[in-house]
């Protein structure tokens, strides 16, 4: 489900939906694992936002941002994506640009300011060690904090590309606990 801002007329809303579906289709063609990961993140994010009691319109925006959170990976060379998580410093620098690239793809679409802000900040961490802007605490949009948790959770519970193995349950739990502690205030 793609959230269409209510301020748009029917023609703009249809165009906006088509643009989002186009980006999702391109992501699916480029890397099906990332596309499926985005679907999982969207479902978990929407569920979390709803359980937090956020308004339905905000839940819908968070779900759309979660669906599109990795569209910036369309700009990352396949050879780098295939090596995840084992990247050189240079490759990490290229990979980390996907947040800004994804936000840039949507920020000029009417009504998508919040969604592009969430996409830009989905790798920020509560303690300020995230990227791309090293935002800290309450400066990270709530939607980005919500999207960040299932992003890490699904990444630790599914096989790593090229490895074909999941993390062990103990290691996976340890990773989630550590990551959650720097994503949300304790």
Name these PLM-found stretches.
Residues 1-186:
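Histidine- and acidic-residue-rich, metal-dependent catalytic cores
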């Amino acid at each position: 489900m793609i959230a269409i801002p209510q301020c748009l007329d029917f023609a703009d809303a249809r165009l906006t939906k088509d643009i989002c579906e186009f980006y999702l289709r391109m992501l699916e063609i480029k890397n099906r694992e990332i596309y499926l990961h985005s679907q999982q993140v969207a479902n978990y994010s929407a569920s979390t936002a709803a359980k937090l009691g956020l308004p339905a319109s905000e839940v819908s925006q968070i779900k759309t941002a979660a669906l599109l959170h990795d569209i910036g990976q369309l700009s990352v060379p396949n050879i780098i994506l295939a090596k995840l998580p084992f990247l050189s410093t240079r490759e990490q620098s290229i990979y980390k640009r996907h947040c800004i690239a994804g936000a840039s793809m949507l920020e000029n679409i009417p009504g998508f300011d919040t969604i592009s802000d969430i996409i830009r900040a989905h790798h920020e961490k509560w303690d300020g060690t995230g990227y791309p802007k090293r935002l800290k605490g309450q400066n990270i949009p709530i939607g980005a904090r919500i999207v960040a948790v299932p992003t890490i959770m699904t990444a630790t519970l599914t096989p790593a590309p090229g490895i074909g193995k999941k993390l062990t349950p103990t290691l996976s739990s340890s990773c989630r606990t550590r990551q959650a502690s720097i994503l949300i205030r304790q």
